[in-house]
Curated annotation (Swiss-Prot):
Disease: Neurodevelopmental disorder with microcephaly, seizures, and brain atrophy: An autosomal recessive neurodevelopmental disorder characterized by severe global developmental delay, developmental regression with loss of milestones, severe microcephaly, and brain abnormalities, primarily cerebral atrophy and hypoplasia of the corpus callosum. Affected individuals develop seizures in the first year of life. Death in childhood may occur.
Region (Disordered): 137-159, 285-328
PH domain: residues covered: 182-282
Protein's recorded name: Exocyst complex component 8
Taxonomic path: Eukaryota, Metazoa, Chordata, Craniata, Vertebrata
Organism domain of life: Eukaryota
């Protein structure tokens, strides 16, 4: 009943405080008038405080829930933006492929259109500014839009314009000697770093009918440039970069295996660059296709004429010609062969890579034992162009710019088709580069929060899981291929392990974590690394080699800390027995010494809570054994001498201090107590250290044996006032 009244009072109080016309001063005045005394005010105060705490908890809970929803929404928006960006690229590729199909199906119509464009262009007059430049050399539907024999005024004008512009570029005189080359478009650009989006330099781009010249701006001379790079349009891909203020009006040029990002003056200039690059690439591809068709065309009339006008030709020479004519008869009239180039275009446009490669395999199998007369060569030339286009699309599928969320299995489709096309080495290189980018992205996205050991658990799980999945997928994709691919994978795995160790060392060793934390982190990394042995991949020696320098530094640093602490305790040594005051404290010390391996510690305990040892010797024992235990977790053969020398240095500090105290002490009782501590060090602590070291390493340490078996204590200078020589 009282609980119900309390709840109703709290709800009434909440409604009163939440009302729109609530005034605090008037409320306090009424409350003071209505209360019977101090007790009522105290109870009311408690109710208000409880209500305040409840409100604060609700507010905190709502903020946390809204924050989580905000983070999840932002992450989904980021994923959606990435997918939309990739979808835009796919639509652009399909548009380009669909536009190229009519040119293939209707070469006569395309040629007529090109001739019409040529006639129209010769009659076009110049204009001012940038339009004047484009009127001379600008957007052509094909490179043959003007006269190609040099007799037309348009061709001469383009050549003069190209010569004039290239004379302003240092280091590209050889380009002026290329016949048939003319300028299509040019303009100023700003280059940005592809990784950090930092401005690099001002450049000027010269787009010719078969290549792209990039020249850097010389600030010392107005209007002069220096040659930077020349890219063939065959291996050049143009990608639109989505505006992300202040980074806008940008586009990317992909030249395997590198990429460059440029910024245009404005959106209009950027659109012109994208359009003219695509148009020029398409025109160059069409031109080369026609040249291949002309080169593959049969030259029958000259051969017939030569035979008809040669009355002295012997019959013996005609005999081998009969089977030669018969060999040239290859049936290419089948419907699937006639439609093969168009079917390949459709498969590439629809991203049916398997279907395209199946058609190529079918054709190769059909022509495997057939001769190569001109019709077959012509067909092969058409098919080779489609193979090149298919290879470019598959290479783009494996580029790191693509989505990495699908894991290594997402690359299997493109890799398998590249292998079927005979591009095994390229497939291996692109697959490993894609996975390296995925591993780098996964490590970079890890949040550094909370304890170091928790972060290392996440880091090891992410990295070694990715490495294991990559190894299994590699074994599936490249089974039965050249063994050189497996060598490339081992090299890649070592490089990836270096990336992991960089992130590991930065968090564990550079942040000066304790030796125990570092030992636990290294232990976790070793355990994950040993899991790779399930697939026959042992990288333990690599992680040892990469971590040895950092672990040596950690051992040396912690050794110096122990030595300094021991020296400080030695300077304050009074050689008195320890009094732990309570049985609980004595029991705790016994457990600690037992965990250190000192099993006979009971004989050094006296009546009540006394211990017949010095505080300095007991503290030294616990610290030394703790150092040894943590160091053994970090141990591998390359660290053997480092660990052994560190132990000897630490032990010598305590031994020298005891020896010096024995020589300097005059009181017989204290001298006997010092001898008891020395006996504990030599007969108990050193054997325990030696035994534990041998158990952890697997072999005894001669230096520790010599130190324990010394016939007398180490000599020191009797006149010295320090504990170390």
């Amino acid at each position: 009943m009282a609980m119900a009244m309390s709840d109703s009072g709290a709800s009434r109080l909440r409604r009163q405080l939440e009302s729109g016309g609530f005034e605090a001063r008037l409320y306090v005045k009424q409350l003071s008038q209505q209360s019977d005394g101090d007790r009522d005010l105290q109870e009311h105060r408690q109710r208000i405080q409880a209500l305040a705490e409840e409100t604060a908890q609700n507010l905190k809970r709502n903020v946390y829930q809204n924050y989580r929803q905000f983070i999840e929404t932002a992450r989904e928006i980021s994923y959606l933006e990435s997918e939309m960006y990739q979808l835009s690229h796919l639509l652009t590729e399909q548009k380009s492929s669909l536009e190229s199909i009519p040119l293939t199906l209707l070469p006569a119509a395309a040629a007529a259109g090109a001739a019409a464009a040529s006639g129209g262009e010769e009659g076009v007059g110049g204009a001012g500014g940038r339009d004047h430049l484009r009127g001379q050399a600008g957007f052509f539907s094909t490179p043959g839009g003007a006269s190609r024999d040099g007799s037309g005024p348009g061709e001469e004008g383009k050549q003069r314009t190209l010569t004039t512009l290239l004379e302003k570029v240092e280091g590209c005189r050889h380009l002026l000697e290329t016949p048939g080359q003319y300028l299509v478009y040019n303009g100023d650009l700003v280059e940005y770093d592809a990784d950090h989006m930092a401005q690099l330099q001002r450049v000027h781009g010269f787009l010719m009918n078969d290549c792209l010249l990039v020249a850097t701006w010389l600030p010392q001379r107005r209007g002069m440039y220096r040659y930077n790079a020349l890219y063939s349009l065959d291996g050049l891909a143009v990608v639109n970069v989505k505006d992300n203020p202040p980074m806008k009006d940008m586009f990317k040029l992909l030249m395997f295996p590198e990429s460059r990002i440029f910024q245009a003056e404005n959106a209009k200039i950027k659109r012109e660059w994208l359009e003219v690059l695509e148009d020029t690439k398409r025109a160059l591809s069409e031109k080369r296709r026609r040249e291949q068709e002309e080169a593959a065309a049969p030259r029958g009339p000259p051969q017939v004429t030569s035979k008809a006008t040669n009355p002295f030709e012997d019959d013996e020479e005609e005999e081998p010609a009969v089977p030669e004519v018969e060999e040239e008869k290859v049936d290419l009239s089948m419907e699937w062969i006639q439609e093969l180039p168009e079917d390949l275009d459709v498969c590439i446009a629809q991203r049916d890579f398997e279907g395209a490669v199946d058609l190529l395999d079918k054709l190769n199998h059909y022509l495997e034992d057939k001769p190569s007369p001109p019709p077959v060569k012509e067909l092969r030339a058409k098919v080779e162009e489609r193979v090149r286009q298919l290879t470019e699309v598959l290479v783009f599928e494996l580029s790191p710019d693509r989505s990495l969320r699908g894991g290594p299995k997402a690359t299997r489709r493109a890799v398998s088709q590249l292998i079927r096309l005979g591009q095994c080495t390229k497939a291996c290189e692109l697959f490993l580069r894609n996975r390296a980018a995925a591993v780098h992205t996964a490590i970079r996205q890890l949040r550094i929060e909370g304890a170091t050991l928790l972060y290392i658990h996440k880091l090891c799980h992410v990295f070694f899981t990715s490495l294991l999945e990559t190894a299994r997928e590699f074994e599936i994709d490249f089974a039965g291929t050249d063994s050189g691919c497996y060598s490339a994978f081992v090299v890649w795995a070592r490089s990836a392990m270096g990336m992991f160790v960089d992130a590991f060392s930065k968090q564990v060793f550079d942040s000066k974590e304790s030796l125990s934390t570092a030992a636990e982190c290294v232990k976790v990394a070793k355990e994950h690394c040993q899991q790779l042995g399930d697939i026959g991949l042992d990288l333990t020696f690599i992680i040892h080699a990469l971590l040895v320098k950092d672990i040596q530094g950690a051992l040396h640093s912690y050794k110096e800390i122990i030595i300094e602490a021991t020296k400080h305790r030695n300077s304050e040594e009074m050689w008195r027995r320890m009094n732990l005051m309570t049985p609980e404290a004595l029991g705790k010390l016994k457990e600690e010494m037992k965990s250190c391996g000192v099993s006979n510690f009971e004989q050094y305990t006296g009546d009540d809570c006394w211990v017949n040892l010095s505080y300095t010797v007991v503290a030294f024992t616990k610290q030394t054994m703790g150092f040894l235990e943590e160091a053994l977790k970090l141990y591998f053969p390359e660290l053997h001498m480092v660990l052994l020398e560190s132990l000897v240095e630490i032990i010598l500090v305590a031994v020298q201090h005891v020896d010096y105290s024995l020589r300097c002490e005059q009181d017989p009782e204290k001298k006997a107590f010092i001898r008891q501590n020395a006996s504990f060090l030599y007969e108990t602590v050193l054997p325990v250290v030696e035994k534990r070291f041998e158990e952890g390493v697997g072999k005894p340490a001669k230096q520790l044996q010599d130190l324990r078996n010394a016939s007398r204590l180490i000599r020191v200078n009797p006149e010295s006032t320090t504990s170390v020589v």
